[in-house]
């Protein structure tokens, strides 16, 4: 583009050097000198403008809140417009579909799945590990169904699932749960950075871990100060690596177990007999080991609740939600359960390299050990490199989700108002700075207490998932009860959870049992001879007293002692999308007719995908 500097005072463009070739040599030199000065001046001006734009990007974004009638032109005929409070979006949504698809598959695959389950395998054994993950996987699916129904019904609700409990349970319950969820994301950054330093020690344990922490810390902060586009591109690359690693690990583990690779020949179920399927000598001890693994499993499944957010991005959530829920089953079965089974068959629970085993090298991931202890040379280094990428990826996600969650809390009045600052590039700047400051905790990696800090942070994150998932399923139950009390038909719902209210009832009941079991495990920790240990209790149950402090603190400060919002007073139409039952039945019949006319291959794809 031509700037004003390319034109004279008359507005005409300056004569080019070629057009003045008939002038004298000296005149030509004078022109070239003048031209060079102009070029330098333009470059300097361009640099100044770039610096000025970068500085201006940190100024507060402009936005307003209005009441509008929202009608999505991309939705089907059966979706009516809804009247809602909307605000001009300050947080820029610059991610493309390829980013969203890959994130739905890979986001959350990090410390919980790749590293923390080493302690679960060591303390519980392979059978206890698999049982724990299977039990939690059922709750995960029930939570996804409940969140899906609510997200389709309330697609424009501010804060999404974080607002459900405030509306359908009580404000104090919602305040405590969402702040604990915020604490989870704040702890994820230092937790993942510590894990990254532990992962690198597989190669070199002589260099100060804080050096690695500093490198990753600066790298991540640098990404997020350049906005959401930089985050989207880096996450796309990270998640591609994670998915490829999981696929390769599954194939390699089967080959190793069958004797096709490594030095040990056919392994089969050898480690289920020696050292055994369960760790522990008594039945009560083995049961306690399973209880210990449950919280680790919740920590590993962390992030699955973000499924509800993806529903909001779809043009027709009524169609996309069943598909997304079906695909979540594959993620649960393949990425979580299948890999746990393969680890249980290929890694003995008494290996001294597992975290918590007390050996000299207690930092190796079971994914690495599944190959390295059988004599496979190069592959363990590749797996460890991808695990390193994975934990950095989750730390990257925490710097994306954490500041936006804090900003959302400030906008709802649940956090100090100054934290709602969003700059012109869509960065929640002050909230981002808070998260970055919290990440400094990671520099304890050079301390001998590194693994203890890791356990504390993981305990907060694990139990916070319990609270968040319980709030989603309990809100779903309260929503259904309010529909019944207010005489509303379920036919008005665009998507009904396939597990109904019974899935949510089971999920809430099971989570309550997990809270009780975790209390027992925390009070009388494993390997302590059944004796009580106060330090272990707070180390493993810290999230519960934090939640209670927020819950009763909100009650006292606001003088709001409501335990449950009255069912007949709940506003079911706030940000709700209304569906016409007759049009939904008509659309379902049309879809069935299309399915009958499909080829066999298309029918198979429709059934499975």
From Swiss-Prot:
It is found in: Cell membrane. Residues 121-123, 195-210, 257-289, 350-374, 449-451, 522-536 are extracellular. Residues 1-48 are annotated as: Disordered. GO terms for cellular component: endoplasmic reticulum; membrane; plasma membrane. Residues 17-44 have a biased composition (Polar residues). Its main location: membrane. This is Leu/Val/Ile amino-acid permease. It comes from Saccharomyces cerevisiae (strain ATCC 204508 / S288c). The lineage of its organism: Eukaryota, Fungi, Dikarya, Ascomycota, Saccharomycotina.
